[in-house]
Amino acid sequence: MKLSTFINLLNSGQASLLSQLLKTSNEFYRASFISAALSRGVYDNFMDGKASFEHLCQKMTVSNREGLSAWLELGVSLGELKRIGKEYQIKGRMSKALLDPKNDAYRALLQEIVEYHYVYVVDAPTMLRKHEWFPFDTMPGELVARSSRVSEPFIFEAVDAAVPLQGDFQLLEVGCGSGIYIQRACTRNPELHAVGLEFQEKVAAMARNNIEAWGLENRATIEHADVRNYSSSQKFDLVTLHQNIYYFPVQERENLFRHLKEYLKPGGQILLTSVCQGGGPGIAALNIQVSTTEGLSPLPDPDQVCQQLEAAGFVEVKAGRLVPFESIWAFHAAIAQ
């Protein structure tokens, strides 16, 4: 490049713009590459973080060797892979961290961002102009159940505050997802029994498998049901809803809370946790998703949730952030004795 060309780029501001675009695109490519390497099983073919090119071609039954080589070289250029001769090694910190089973929730969250949030952000303007909604049945329920576990440490605190350490206690969980919060409640109180409702059949099956794996099948039951049509003579001490209030239209939430009151014992309580309006970019992207998908609705406003609980007849309504400086909230209320 000639010096005059470089000076012109600097003076025009385009050099700075190009630098910003390159930085942004590199992180976009990094997220896409890592997510694909994990979700498409490429990293599964590495042994102790290493794999030869021939081994990958064989395991992946690839005929387009040039295409696979080009894809792997993107990983090398990003620093996620290292190539020594004809062998590739997993090098990137994020790749290594997300391969750890204990970080599965973060692995799922990355895939959700790359494969789903991206689509909502890019396609929402077109869908809105066409007066169309994203279909609900394309939502990856099992993936969302996994990624939602990123919030576990904060929601665990809310569960612990609502569940006593001992004594007979009956829990109804609406939208139980993976069942992890039922497990938490059962672990906290060995006398607790729970019913988990799950709207999506595949997610309900996953929760049942988890309950059995945790040895809780005699204490927890998972039902595939829409809570709005749920009927039971059983009364509960606590009803919980974690990260799913936006699955119910705003205008239906007050009636939902009234419906849930029917299943509570005198003095029973409700615990609701949710991301709410006013968060960072990740929460803003989620709000696009729930605001443009059929059957869902925008993330809740904390004040509005409190008002709806009170209008439904709950007392002692309290709300508070679970995470400082982020819009993840817990709402707690009770019915009269």
Q: Which sequence ranges carry the predicted segments?
A:
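Conserved SAM-binding loop of SAM-dependent methyltransferases across substrates and taxa
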Residues: 178-190
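Conserved SAM/SAH-binding beta-strand->alpha-helix loop
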Residues: 200
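Short, glycine-/aromatic-enriched active-site segment of Class I SAM-dependent methyltransferases
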Residues: 277-295
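A short glycine-rich, Lys/Arg-flanked "PGG" loop and its adjoining helix->strand segment in the class I
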Residues: 254-266
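Conserved beta-strand signature within the Rossmann-like core of class I S-adenosyl-L-methionine
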Residues: 267-274
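Short alpha-helix
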Residues: 297-313
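A short acidic, Gly/Pro-enriched loop at the edge of an enzyme's catalytic core
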Residues: 228-239
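Conserved Class I S-adenosyl-L-methionine-dependent methyltransferase catalytic core
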Residues: 24, 36, 74-169
